[in-house]
């Protein structure tokens, strides 16, 4: 399962990905924020 993360500007939790390039395609993400170090939080969470 993907780790959860939270962005101050979003309600609820997103999916945490451990890379710099942004959110991966194919998961329906439409918002993101970056979390240090080297992670990105993607909304809306997939598979929940």
UniProtKB/Swiss-Prot annotation:
Residues with PTM Serine amide: 46
Disulfide bond positions: 5-41, 7-33, 23-42
GO CC annotations on file: extracellular region; nematocyst
Pfam families reported in the protein's UniProt record: Defensin_4 (PF07936)
Keyword Acetylation among UniProt keywords: no
Location of the protein in the cell: Secreted
Main location: secreted
InterPro entries per the UniProt record, alphabetical: BDS_K_chnl_tox, Myo_ane_neurotoxin_sf
One term of GO molecular function: ion channel inhibitor activity
Proregion residues excised on maturation: 47-48
Keyword Secreted attributed: yes
Keywords: Amidation, Disulfide bond, Neurotoxin, Protease inhibitor, Secreted, Toxin
SUPFAM superfamilies recorded: Defensin-like
Stated role: Neurotoxin that induces paralysis when injected into crabs. May function in antimicrobial activity as it displays inhibitory activity towards the B.licheniformis enzyme subtilisin A (SUBTA) and the recombinant S.maltophilia protease 1 (rStmPr1) enzyme. Also displays inhibitory activity against various proteases including the porcine pancreatic elastase (PPE) and proteinase K (PK).
Similarity comment text for this entry: Belongs to the sea anemone type 3 (BDS) potassium channel toxin family.
Other observations noted: Negative results: does not show any inhibitory activity against chymotrypsin, trypsin or papain.
Protein name, as recorded: U-actitoxin-Cgg3
Species this protein is from: Condylactis gigantea (Giant Caribbean anemone)
